[in-house]
């Protein structure tokens, strides 16, 4: 039986910590929006961030963008923390995401184009991961 992780939306303090401690490690500076922009989007309701927890410990985060009235949620940032990687958690979370994004008819995954990415190898790996999870790329 696979481990059960709990999902909940992060508050401003938690999101700030995730940005400073995790996102700056997980994404190159050219891909990372300023924290103030992310917090403003959360405050005005156009974005929210899921924290996925193993007990009380953060295992992954997914930052979603969905403007009011939109039926499409966009996966803007997604990362599994290093100690939880390579165990299938990322694929499990992508499969579970639609049940958490209530009201969305589709989920759009944003990913860097390899020829324009700062880190081409990472961009290719990301696209490969999404393709293995069943996303059309």
Protein language model features and the residues they cover:
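Conserved GNAT acetyl-CoA-binding A-motif
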Residues: 101-122
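Residue-level detector of beta-propeller blades
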Residues: 9, 58, 136-137
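Short amphipathic alpha-helix that is part of the acyltransferase structural core
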Residues: 1-37, 53
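Conserved beta-strand in the GNAT
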Residues: 51, 56-66, 72-79
């Amino acid at each position: 039986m696979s481990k059960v992780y709990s999902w909940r939306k992060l508050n401003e303090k938690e999101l700030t910590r995730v940005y400073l401690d995790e996102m700056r490690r997980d994404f190159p500076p050219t891909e990372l929006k300023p924290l103030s922009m992310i917090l403003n989007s959360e405050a005005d309701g156009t974005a929210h961030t899921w924290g996925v927890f193993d007990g009380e410990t953060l295992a992954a985060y997914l930052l979603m963008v969905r403007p009011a009235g939109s039926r499409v949620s966009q996966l803007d940032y997604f990362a599994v923390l290093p100690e939880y990687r390579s165990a299938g958690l990322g694929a499990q979370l992508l499969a579970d995401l639609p049940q958490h994004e209530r009201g969305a008819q589709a989920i759009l995954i944003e990913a860097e184009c390899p020829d324009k990415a700062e880190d081409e190898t990472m961009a290719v790996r990301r696209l490969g991961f999404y393709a293995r999870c069943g996303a059309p790329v």
